[in-house]
């Protein structure tokens, strides 16, 4: 059995202000995202933005992630609780963000920013997709430090006893998600993105691979107590929300493949 590192969720005390690791992980993801978007805007001739516009784009994305992620968590996972405790909606440092809600928020942000600049919505998604796993991985580290979203009970040697997870060891599912959604997804997308490839291949890969990684990790993660298993005594809310991403990603990849075979897909 592995030992869960007892890390104080509060990284810094600035007088009465508590700076949480969870928030710092989001700040790291935002800053790293801005840096990489600026770099990509410099080196990609097809980039839909100029390097100096990376800050504005990052602001739109961050707003979409935070608002969409929080609203999505409230609606998808815990609406009755927040209905009776409305002020808790604003306590972001306690955790409670939904990737799928954040994804919807980012799509809305893309639409607004693309309209503002007069650029193609899908080109913007293709441009940003390789950078997204940085933020996903950072968020999962924040979950791990908070000791939340732990996995199912296990007798595996990699099990951990979490402070809020009861006396039995559980899978460190946050680290599984950090590895698949963060490290693996970033590595694959970045390596593909630095080569000549059909347009929108990265966008399709991101949606398909993220949805698949999340679907797999949900088998190790403890279901949300307010829902449990929704279908077949094994399917969770996270898996249900991932299915549309997998399907849409597969459709994009099939279209890219067909257009490539017919020499109708531009390489970028």
From Swiss-Prot:
Pfam families: LGT (PF01790). The chain crosses the membrane at residues 17-37, 57-77, 90-110, 117-137, 174-194, 200-220, 238-258. Keywords: Cell inner membrane, Cell membrane, Membrane, Transferase, Transmembrane, Transmembrane helix. The keyword Cell membrane applies. Its EC number is 2.5.1.145. A 1,2-diacyl-sn-glycero-3-phospho-(1'-sn-glycerol) binds at residue 140. It is found in: Cell inner membrane. It is a multi-pass membrane protein. The keyword Transmembrane applies. It comes from the Bacteria. It is an enzyme of class 2 (transferase). GO terms for cellular component: plasma membrane. GO terms for biological process: lipoprotein biosynthetic process. Its main location: membrane. InterPro entries: Lgt. GO terms for molecular function: phosphatidylglycerol-prolipoprotein diacylglyceryl transferase activity. Pathway: Protein modification; lipoprotein biosynthesis (diacylglyceryl transfer). Catalyzes the transfer of the diacylglyceryl group from phosphatidylglycerol to the sulfhydryl group of the N-terminal cysteine of a prolipoprotein, the first step in the formation of mature lipoproteins. NCBIfam families: lgt. Belongs to the Lgt family. This is Phosphatidylglycerol--prolipoprotein diacylglyceryl transferase. It comes from Francisella philomiragia subsp. philomiragia (strain ATCC 25017 / CCUG 19701 / FSC 153 / O#319-036).
